[in-house]
Amino acid sequence: MSVLVNKDSKIIVQGFTGSEGTFHAEQMIEYGTNLVGGVTPGKGGQEHLGKPVFNTVKEAVDQVDADVSIIFVPPAFAADAIMEAADAGIKVIITITEGIPVADMIKASDYIKDKDCRLIGPNCPGVITPGEAKVGIMPGFVFSKGKVGIVSKSGTLTYEAADQVVKQGLGITTAIGIGGDPIIGTTTKEAVELLMNDPETECIVMIGEIGGQLEADAARWVKENGNKKPVVGFIAGETAPKGRTMGHAGAIVGGDDDTAEAKKRIMSECGIHVVDSPAEIGKKVAEVIG
């Protein structure tokens, strides 16, 4: 069992023939991901990396039954790519693109809310189910199969947490990089919920950062639903000055509850095992799994 992507997922790359799309598609194919083709308008009918190129996502869905898309489209066109994927019937839309204008994301987010799809990102590292599918830009060798799920706003800390968990001999079920923009498709709570409902996931690592309410919402949901599985939490940005964007466009402290300190307090009150340093994540997971 896994969430979002697995060995049966039929994955396409939007922005397939561009430099980013090409590089990461090669890595995904090498990993063993079931990549069935890609989309570059105007290049339909060609082959790239031994896979078919389509002019539209609809063609890819009709011809190769694509159900997952990963987007490497420049920021100005990325919201359109998201909406096109949703229109065509893609079930999981993973958007790597950074710097999509907020106004565009408001439009795309509103457009897809009634569609039968799930958006991950934008500005995220993607999703990996070790040994089955790597749909993103993460280094595949860091991850191995196991029983710990990861939800993270930070790409780098996703890899760090995975490395520590694997070194504890526990491994990963699915790691979900949700992205650090102000408007994202799947929230921390929704990603945690997916892993809570996955029978193979025995523990969840939740990595957040300053800014917004996502981690507090997730923590309260975990408590309200009876703390069914242990959750280990870390919040990045404790030393960030108020009012300044730190790394991610969404990482800006607005109110008192946006600070790392406030988030850690809320998480602890909700029964989450909070660590003060990312270096402690692996040990804490091993401790709570027992």
Regions found by a protein language model. Name each.
Residues 1-290:
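Catalytic-core regions of core metabolic enzymes
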